[in-house]
């Protein structure tokens, strides 16, 4: 009993601890960005200013009344009428502010942006670590972000989906839904849109309605594709695993409903879950002991049990779908870490801390979804540990790619154009279809308030982490 009463206090202490750590990293990030700005000025500014002077001087040398057949205007899409100087100046000033914004918000984009101005600055930065040390740092950081949340889960006093843990589990589920939605709308989708929006801004002479809407529209389509794909997978799994039992559970023999129950248990079944279900629903225990011999007594409760089994199967499928989305998300995190360590040790450490702060609340939410899906605490932790394979694969991919080009694009939010928005669609589907409906169950006013606060807490956590990135 004392342990149950202390559970919300542990959750509150954990959230406050991570919020404090986030503020500390924010201060560290600001200081590190200032240092990187100074380093950027020292290493690359002279080259870029000379480049700017060359462009600017060339425009003045040809005069304001000149035609636009000069070699520089040919480089800027060859317009027919005379605003070469304005176009070039505007393009360069935008490029400068674009780099400043990226340098403040994404430390791991330094390598990519410097490469755009010339390769002279990049090799000096990339040789900060030799090959063996680079792999050791990057893989070690990836293991850290995968193992740290794993140990945090030991502090959560939830063993299974049982009545005595139900209130705390519901709060964790609300936190998970807020984290999933915040991650999708504040992290994945904005990062997927960034390279496309910058591409359109770098070409001010073109119409925004044609060249700008295409890539942005593709991001939205990939988000919808993720939602539809997860829907199709869930319907397929439900049809294969429980469709027969559910379709006949209401009107046929008791053995059909019972068979559906047996199928659902094969995925995540433990003695703890079995005992908790017997504790929670006496009618199910009566069915197991009597084997359906007393039809009149079991008849009235059969539709309710079929509905409960359908809900349980839906939750189990959604738990595994969430793991699939988390695997893809961890792959992009691994790419970001690998690319950042190619840019330097300090940059890699800062990126690792940011990803770690992002992963801990995310993994807590995934843990709650798996437990709600019927897994025990140990099973949920093992399944989450498997998602570390995606992070390790992403890190290795970023390190093996020549020059870290793919890793740099992923770290800056572009990556393969479909990965981030497709993953965001998966997170949106799991949060809205599987998790949020669980929060609509009847509860006391205090419990409902705590669930709403938990959802807002997950969103606020992602807002803080978005500022760090």
From Swiss-Prot:
It catalyses: Zn(2+)(in) = Zn(2+)(out). InterPro entries: ZIP. Keywords: Endoplasmic reticulum, Golgi apparatus, Ion transport, Membrane, Methylation, Phosphoprotein, Transmembrane, Transmembrane helix, Transport, Zinc, Zinc transport. Residues 242-263 have a biased composition (Basic residues). Residues 42-56, 66-114, 264-285 have a biased composition (Basic and acidic residues). Pfam families: Zip. The keyword Ribosomal protein does not apply. The keyword Magnesium does not apply. It is found in: Endoplasmic reticulum membrane; Golgi apparatus, cis-Golgi network membrane. The modification Pros-methylhistidine is found at residue 66. GO terms for biological process: B cell differentiation; intracellular zinc ion homeostasis; regulation of ferroptosis; skin epidermis development. GO terms for molecular function: zinc ion transmembrane transporter activity. Methylation at some His residue by METTL9 leads to reduced zinc-binding. It comes from the Eukaryota. It is a multi-pass membrane protein. The modification Phosphoserine is found at residues 275-276. Its main location: endoplasmic reticulum. The chain crosses the membrane at residues 10-30, 138-158, 169-189, 214-234, 386-406, 410-430, 448-468. Residues 42-121, 242-310 are annotated as: Disordered. Homodimer. PANTHER family: ZINC TRANSPORTER SLC39A7, ZINC TRANSPORTER SLC39A7 HISTIDINE-RICH MEMBRANE PROTEIN KE4. Transports Zn(2+) from the endoplasmic reticulum (ER)/Golgi apparatus to the cytosol, playing an essential role in the regulation of cytosolic zinc levels. Acts as a gatekeeper of zinc release from intracellular stores, requiring post-translational activation by phosphorylation, resulting in activation of multiple downstream pathways leading to cell growth and proliferation. Has an essential role in B cell development and is required for proper B cell receptor signaling. Belongs to the ZIP transporter (TC 2.A.5) family. KE4/Catsup subfamily. This is Zinc transporter SLC39A7. The gene is SLC39A7.
């Amino acid at each position: 009993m004392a342990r149950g009463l202390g559970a919300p206090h542990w959750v509150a202490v954990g959230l406050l601890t991570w919020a404090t750590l986030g503020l500390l990293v924010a201060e560290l990030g600001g200081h590190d960005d200032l240092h990187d700005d100074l380093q950027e000025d020292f290493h690359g500014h002279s080259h870029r200013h000379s480049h700017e002077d060359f462009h600017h001087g060339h425009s003045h040398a040809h005069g304001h009344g000149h035609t636009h057949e000069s070699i520089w205007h040919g480089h800027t899409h060859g317009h027919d009428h005379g605003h070469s100087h304005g176009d070039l100046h505007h393009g360069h000033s935008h490029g400068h502010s674009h780099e400043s914004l990226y340098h403040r918000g994404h430390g791991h984009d330094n390598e990519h942006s410097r490469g755009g101005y010339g390769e002279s600055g990049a090799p000096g930065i990339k040789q900060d670590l030799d090959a063996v040390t680079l792999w050791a740092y990057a893989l070690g950081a990836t293991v850290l972000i995968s193992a740290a949340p794993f140990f945090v889960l030991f502090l959560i006093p939830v063993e299974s989906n049982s009545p005595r843990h139900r209130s705390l589990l519901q709060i964790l589920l609300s936190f998970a839904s807020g984290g999933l939605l915040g991650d999708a709308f504040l992290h994945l989708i904005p990062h997927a849109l960034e390279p496309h929006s910058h591409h359109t801004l770098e070409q001010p002479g073109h119409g925004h309605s044609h060249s700008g809407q295409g890539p942005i529209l593709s991001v939205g389509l990939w988000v919808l594709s993720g939602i539809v794909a997860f829907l199709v997978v869930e319907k397929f799994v439900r049809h294969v695993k429980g469709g027969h039992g559910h379709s006949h559970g209401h009107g046929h023999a008791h053995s059909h409903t019972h068979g559906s129950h047996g199928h659902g248990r094969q995925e995540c079944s433990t003695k703890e879950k079995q005992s908790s279900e017997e504790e929670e629903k006496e009618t199910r225990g009566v069915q197991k002991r009597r084997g359906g011999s007393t039809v009149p007594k079991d008849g009235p409760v059969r539709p309710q049990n079929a509905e409960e089994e359908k809900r349980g199967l839906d939750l189990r499928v959604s738990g595994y779908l969430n793991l699939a989305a988390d695997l893809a998300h961890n792959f992009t995190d691994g790419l970001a870490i690998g690319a950042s360590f190619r840019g330097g040790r300090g940059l890699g450490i800062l990126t690792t801390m940011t990803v770690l702060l992002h992963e801990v609340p995310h993994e807590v939410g995934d843990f709650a979804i798996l437990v709600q899906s019927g897994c025990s605490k140990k099973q949920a932790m093992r399944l989450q540990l498997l998602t570390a394979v995606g992070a390790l694969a992403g890190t290795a991919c970023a390190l093996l790619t020549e020059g870290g080009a793919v890793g740099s694009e992923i770290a800056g939010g572009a990556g393969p154009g479909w990965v981030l928005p497709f993953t965001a669609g998966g997170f949106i589907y799991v949060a809205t279809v599987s998790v949020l409906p669980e929060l609509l169950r009847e509860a006391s006013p205090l419990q409902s308030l705590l669930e709403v606060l938990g959802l807002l807490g997950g969103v606020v956590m992602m807002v803080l982490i978005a500022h760090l990135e």
